[in-house]
């Protein structure tokens, strides 16, 4: 009841809340993305074993972002975070060509999850500052994003350390949240 009243109150006064699940393979830059958005700075990170959760304010939307560790042995725990997720940010290490197939498999499994059927999908093609980074177009093709027909999706080139592209991604999320409301 409290969550319902909070959402109703927020909607009446123009503020919205959006629950975001941020996932991706280990080392993709999820935690760096989260704290660049939250604090505006790059922090020293260690591999996330559990999760980090922060609220990021953008325009009139309060994004509650759950950054969940990406190591293979803890990915089975991701499903515990699916409930009430309105948006997924899937972070890709654009420089890691050897694991793009693994990222595709992980993403495809998530796309088949019933609890995520109404979530919008934002892919951050991260680490674009590195010289061998795959372009957003190449990642789109390798992930098979064009085959996603049942939900809104978008890919955004990003560099978490500089912040490049991060707010453009939040802009897309905020516009798609409005379309779903």
UniProtKB/Swiss-Prot annotation:
One of its GO terms (molecular function) is GTPase activity. There is a cross-link at residue 127 (Glycyl lysine isopeptide (Lys-Gly) (interchain with G-Cter in ubiquitin)). Keywords: ER-Golgi transport, Golgi apparatus, GTP-binding, Isopeptide bond, Lipoprotein, Myristate, Nucleotide-binding, Protein transport, Transport, Ubl conjugation. A lipid is attached at residue 2 (N-myristoyl glycine). GTP binds at residues 25-32, 48, 70, 126-129, 160-161. It comes from the Eukaryota. One of its GO terms (cellular component) is plasma membrane. Its main location: Golgi. It is found in: Golgi apparatus. GO terms for biological process: intracellular protein transport; macroautophagy; vesicle-mediated transport. It holds the Pfam family Arf. GTP-binding protein involved in protein trafficking; may modulate vesicle budding and uncoating within the Golgi apparatus. Present with 25000 molecules/cell in log phase SD medium. Belongs to the small GTPase superfamily. Arf family. NCBIfam families: small_GTP. This is ADP-ribosylation factor 2. It comes from Saccharomyces cerevisiae (strain ATCC 204508 / S288c) (Baker's yeast). The lineage of its organism: Eukaryota, Fungi, Dikarya, Ascomycota, Saccharomycotina. The gene is ARF2.
């Amino acid at each position: 009841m409290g969550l319902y009243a909070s959402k109703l109150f927020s909607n009446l006064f123009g503020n919205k809340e959006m629950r975001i699940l941020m996932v991706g393979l280990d080392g993709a830059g999820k935690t760096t993305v989260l704290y660049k958005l939250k604090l505006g700075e790059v922090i020293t990170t260690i591999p996330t074993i559990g999760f980090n959760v922060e609220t990021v304010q953008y325009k009139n939307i309060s994004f509650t972002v759950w950054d969940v560790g990406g190591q293979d042995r803890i990915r089975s725990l991701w499903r515990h975070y699916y409930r009430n997720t309105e948006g997924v940010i899937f972070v890709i290490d654009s420089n890691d060509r050897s694991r793009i197939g693994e990222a595709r498999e992980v993403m495809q499994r998530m796309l088949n999850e019933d609890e995520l059927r109404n979530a919008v999908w934002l892919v951050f093609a991260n680490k674009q500052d590195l010289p061998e980074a795959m372009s957003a177009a190449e990642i789109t093709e390798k992930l098979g994003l064009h085959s996603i027909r049942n939900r809104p999706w978008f890919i955004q080139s990003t560099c978490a350390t500089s912040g490049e592209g991060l707010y453009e991604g939040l802009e897309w999320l905020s516009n798609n949240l409005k379309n779903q409301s």
